[in-house]
């Protein structure tokens, strides 16, 4: 059974989790500013100033409508919204899939520079080599079954392999 802060997932635990799905759920008609306002109204721990700083660093204008932006920019906006929360748990589903290497670098820097350092961070990915340097522990799941749960150092020492090669 999965517990979040000692409780089963439910209405009360959702306020502690910041989730980035693999596919966007943001409405294309909305402006970036609408989305920032929505997240600020919805989540007590949302840091509006942090969101606007990250948006500004990418030259994304608050008045831009999502439907006018590239897929990569939309994904970055969604990541910015998720990482602008001071959550206890961040769950990121394939955050670097389908983007070019430069965008991957930006995404990883955004994650590392903006998550709550007291929080836990779970990243689901098939691109292990791109994130291996930031991992502490890994869980491998195959066909819905837990295959391995270990520290990265343990895999390297006992197996003599990188996590990606394992």
Which residues does each PLM region occupy?
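Catalytic Walker B motif of ABC-type/P-loop ATPase nucleotide-binding domains
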Residues: 90-94, 99
């Amino acid at each position: 059974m999965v517990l979040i802060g000692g409780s089963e997932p439910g209405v009360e635990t959702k306020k502690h989790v910041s989730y980035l799905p693999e596919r966007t759920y943001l409405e294309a008609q909305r402006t970036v500013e609408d989305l920032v306002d929505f997240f600020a109204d919805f989540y007590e721990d949302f840091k509006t100033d942090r969101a606007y700083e990250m948006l500004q660093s990418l030259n994304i204008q608050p008045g831009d409508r999502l439907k006018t932006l590239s897929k990569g920019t939309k994904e970055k906006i969604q990541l910015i919204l998720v990482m602008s929360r001071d959550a206890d748990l961040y769950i990121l589903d394939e955050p670097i899939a389908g983007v070019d290497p430069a965008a991957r670098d930006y995404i990883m820097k955004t994650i590392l520079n903006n998550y709550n350092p007291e929080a836990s961070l779970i990243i689901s990915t098939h691109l292990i080599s791109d994130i291996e340097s930031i991992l502490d522990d890994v869980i491998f799941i195959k066909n819905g079954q837990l295959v391995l749960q270990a520290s990265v150092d343990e895999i390297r020492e006992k197996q003599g392999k990188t996590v990606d090669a394992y």
